[in-house]
Amino acid sequence: VTTDSALLRFGTDRALVRAQVVRTSHATSVELEITRGKMNRVRINRANPVRARDILGIVRTVLFAPEDLALVKGDPSARRRFLDDLLVVLQPHQAATRSDYDRVLRQRNALLKSARAAGKLTTNHEATLDVWDQHLAQAGARVLRGRLDVLGQVAGPLAAAYASLTDGSKLASAHYRSTIVSDIEDDGDAAVQPDGNSEALLEASASELQERILAALTAKRQQEVERGMTLVGPHRDELLLTLGGVPAKGYASHGETWSLALSLRLASYQAMLEDDSRPGAGPILILDDVFAELDADRRARLAKVVADAEQVLVTAAVEADVPDSLKGHVLRVTPGAIHAAGEGPGA
């Protein structure tokens, strides 16, 4: 689903979602208006509409869904998005940084395509590229620094979560490979090399990373003109996942893939808890039809791991798929209606 229009009931063009959010002892009302073909409108505490990104951080959630398999088996973009989504939760100002980076990247790519079409790099192209390089390096350095920080926060919890969901015979690890250190193609070929290359970047400041990105852009300029696209930067980096030192992509079994994907989400949950450990500040865990994909042992292990969460929402097509330990307040959804268990049609 690429737009929120799919959330609208068939035959309608508008929907309102209202929520009262209590985090620690602070209550906030949030209203989201979804209108077909238009930008979403958001109100906080019934004030004037604000940008949708302004509600980031008000409701912290961690979603487990069948689509999470793409975090392990899919293209590098899925893993980059995982890091960026968590980064925005932990550092909301990074939403604007990422938006700036994407905008500059589009402009720079358009200029490179223009140079390729001209068959040469003119003086005007050179001067304009120098300007875009500075902007791209500045925003890219902040994105990269944030990703490395987030990876440091989830690496330990990832290993612990995978051990808790399995027999613990394989160590789950995550490594970052940056294009400002070596080339990585978007087809994910770098995944056959399990080790990351970010060690030299871990202690680098944003300004130092900016200089390294600038140097990489300069070194690649002729190649970029020939291909009409930006070849280095956070948009081309890769998060490599390994099990027992072996790349998970292409080598992990279906069960291992599921366990690793779930472990990534559990690691992000743990990172949020550590970021704000106040009572009542924990993120909401949403398990969207994941138990149907797990065997009995993994169901029991996952249920045990999430049992201590402050709030857990579970969806399932078959109630028997949900472990008894997670059955609290049960709601049944029928076409056009939601009923408490024991009420409504079929009660």
Set out the residue ranges of the language-model regions:
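Conserved NTPase motor "head" modules and their coupling/switch loops across ABC/AAA+ ATPases, GTPases
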Residues: 120-284, 293-297, 301-304, 308-309, ...
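Nucleotide-state sensing region of NTPase/ATPase domains
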Residues: 1-78, 82-94, 152-160, 209, ...
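Structural recognition of the conserved hydrophobic beta-strand(s) that form the central parallel beta-sheet
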Residues: 19, 311-317
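Long, non-coiled-coil amphipathic alpha-helical linker/lever segments
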Residues: 3-4, 83, 90-147, 284
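Hydrophobic positions in the central parallel beta-sheet of the AAA+
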Residues: 62-64, 283-286
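Hydrophobic/aromatic beta-strand patches that form the interior of the parallel beta-sheet core
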Residues: 62, 313, 329-331
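Walker B catalytic acidic pair
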Residues: 288-290
